[in-house]
Amino acid sequence: MSEFLPFSRPAMGVEELAAVKEVLESGWITTGPKNQALEQAFCQLTGNQHAIAVSSATAGMHITLMALEIGKGDEVITPSLTWVSTLNMISLLGATPVMVDVDRDTLMVTPEAIESAITPRTKAIIPVHYAGAPADIDAIRAIGERYGIAVIEDAAHAVGTYYKGRHIGAKGTAIFSFHAIKNITCAEGGLIVTDNENLARQLRMLKFHGLGVDAYDRQTWGRAPQAEVLTPGYKYNLTDINAAIALTQLVKLEHLNTRRREIAQQYQQALAALPFQPLSLPAWPHVHAWHLFIIRVDEQRCGISRDALMEALKERGIGTGLHFRAAHTQKYYRERFPTLSLPNTEWNSERICSLPLFPDMTTADADRVITALQQLAGQ
């Protein structure tokens, strides 16, 4: 049997090893100069004025919601077809997640669904740039501006994604992920971009105990050695070890995403003759980062269920993923919102399957996946 082909594998090389070695030898391994360099590099990528590195995108979502003073009695609009951390952070702050449906074929939350869910209690909108493609963010921001509601972009899948010529996050507030399967990774990490100076200042406080400065600030700039707590905060800072890896990966971003695009094109060409349905691309001008390549496996159309397909691929030494099981169908949220019905989300949640997609995949690896799909489709 061939070696197991995982759904994802981080693309690490000698450059990342050298970056870690440099930090270890520097004597400063926690938050410091590599964090600052990463934040500056991200501002150059997205065009934002501020970037705040954090220990995870979940941490970034938590403190962004906190900085916007979202809490008990507030509502936050978000798709159900997303990673549960967003719903969890909303709920942990005492607010109510208002889950809305997505477009059946792009899996993007639509401006129409968002606007129809707005109430006097709506405090924020969290659209998801799904699988590496952009949501229609201009239209969504216009809704936010019209109603005076904050828009927080979930850009966990969108490092290297462009919308109408602008990198995701530009002129707004967005949260990126550097988790192990993401387009660039440092194992665990995240980053928030914003043009709102007051928000950026609050985020920096909240990510580090509510202090106005961190240890590197105090040592480097000669600030007061005993910083004051300005507001209760968290320990969500990113170490320089992680930041150095992320910074090295960011330099490689164009190469990494180009390889992802090549594999995606290989899949697209092969799937044209198969019953498995890939996602449709958004109609607006964009550059896809191809974080995920997703097919829909409809048993009536394909002759096999999604779960059976995933198991059959596993038996052939091929890993897959599920992004995502709809949040409102999971125990806690199902019991909290028992009457919620989101037909497009539910249809897709039962059928979506993420195929292997990572930069170190070879053409032969992709061919192996395609051959297995052809066999399982009876071709």
From Swiss-Prot:
Its EC number is 2.6.1.87. It catalyses: UDP-4-amino-4-deoxy-beta-L-arabinose + 2-oxoglutarate = UDP-beta-L-threo-pentopyranos-4-ulose + L-glutamate. Its cofactor is pyridoxal 5'-phosphate. InterPro entries: ArnB_NH2Trfase, DegT/StrS_aminotransferase, PyrdxlP-dep_Trfase, PyrdxlP-dep_Trfase_major, PyrdxlP-dep_Trfase_small. Pathway: Nucleotide-sugar biosynthesis; UDP-4-deoxy-4-formamido-beta-L-arabinose biosynthesis; UDP-4-deoxy-4-formamido-beta-L-arabinose from UDP-alpha-D-glucuronate: step 2/3; Bacterial outer membrane biogenesis; lipopolysaccharide biosynthesis. SUPFAM superfamilies: PLP-dependent transferases (SSF53383). GO terms for biological process: lipid A biosynthetic process; lipopolysaccharide biosynthetic process; response to antibiotic. Keywords: Aminotransferase, Antibiotic resistance, Lipid A biosynthesis, Lipid biosynthesis, Lipid metabolism, Lipopolysaccharide biosynthesis, Pyridoxal phosphate, Transferase. The modification N6-(pyridoxal phosphate)lysine is found at residue 182. GO terms for cellular component: membrane. It is an enzyme of class 2 (transferase). One of its GO terms (molecular function) is UDP-4-amino-4-deoxy-L-arabinose aminotransferase. Belongs to the DegT/DnrJ/EryC1 family. ArnB subfamily. Homodimer. Catalyzes the conversion of UDP-4-keto-arabinose (UDP-Ara4O) to UDP-4-amino-4-deoxy-L-arabinose (UDP-L-Ara4N). The modified arabinose is attached to lipid A and is required for resistance to polymyxin and cationic antimicrobial peptides. This is UDP-4-amino-4-deoxy-L-arabinose--oxoglutarate aminotransferase. It comes from Shigella flexneri.
